[in-house]
Amino acid sequence: MAAGVPCALVTSCSSVFSGDQLVQHILGTEDLIVEVTSNDAVRFYPWTIDNKYYSADINLCVVPNKFLVTAEIAESVQAFVVYFDSTQKSGLDSVSSWLPLAKAWLPEVMILVCDRVSEDGINRQKAQEWCIKHGFELVELSPEELPEEDDDFPESTGVKRIVQALNANVWSNVVMKNDRNQGFSLLNSLTGTNHSIGSADPCHPEQPHLPAADSTESLSDHRGGASNTTDAQVDSIVDPMLDLDIQELASLTTGGGDVENFERLFSKLKEMKDKAATLPHEQRKVHAEKVAKAFWMAIGGDRDEIEGLSSDEEH
């Protein structure tokens, strides 16, 4: 494994579905390139994440069991994807044995995967309760219930959701593209919220973005209606220091694409990420959604585009 290359550690706690099969699903091919290691049991699959915001070279590292995790692997883990057999009532027991390592790594992305929840084994409620308790996201590869076609805010499911989550992560070796309006997506990955702004592209070239000097006024104007639920939620979370953070982030996001600007952008993202990490997991998502709304309005976004962003609001 090349030194300094971050990895998404992939493992399976099922005897009928391997970590390598999960990687095949993620990469969308059975013709995989694998990096040879001294330990044949551990396999590294190079993957270049290339989207409109950034590119990053990472490894999908398949580790069959926790005893094969070396210090080098542990230092490189920035995402954790684990498959379990939901048809077995004890299906989560093996996954739980990985928790001490996951807590040591503290990856931003942690995904619990199964084919689909099972009433005869691990049902949806039990799986969701486990995920909430331990900070994971549940993804079913073949869910019985798919999002309705007329849903204005459809959630991604299956492998698509796994790929989406890995794309949303801010990898340590990320190379930003010259796109000046990627801030909202970066904030989503920073704070852990899994929503997008409706079904629209978060970056609108024609969308007017305000300079930092005017951002505070814009944010204040958007908050005008005290009876508005969304505004009330934003007001309840934006304290003076956080408000300053949002304004600086907005300024950096809408500023020039030079290296110094991006370095400061990621430094600020890291600071805000560390602050969010101090919150209990149950509160982090709510915090993320509220901060995301305030930030979106701070860069001149249209509030109508974020109506219904919160998971607890009616769509």
From Swiss-Prot:
The source organism is: Homo sapiens
Q: Which GO terms describe its biological process?
A: protein transport
State the protein's name.
Alpha- and gamma-adaptin-binding protein p34
Q: What is the lineage of its organism?
A: Eukaryota, Metazoa, Chordata, Craniata, Vertebrata
Quaternary state and partners of this protein?
Associated with AP-1 and AP-2 complexes.
Q: Name one GO cellular component term.
A: cytosol
Look up the domain of life of the source.
Eukaryota
Q: Which residues carry this modification: Phosphoserine?
A: S310, S311
Q: Which PANTHER family match?
A: ALPHA- AND GAMMA-ADAPTIN-BINDING PROTEIN P34
Quote the disease note of the record: Keratoderma, palmoplantar, punctate 1A: An autosomal dominant dermatological disorder characterized by multiple hyperkeratotic, centrally indented, papules that develop in early adolescence, or later, and are irregularly distributed on the palms and soles (other palmoplantar keratoses have mostly diffuse hyperkeratinization). In mechanically irritated areas, confluent plaques can be found. Interfamilial and intrafamilial severity shows broad variation. In some cases, PPKP1 is associated with the development of early- and late-onset malignancies, including squamous cell carcinoma.
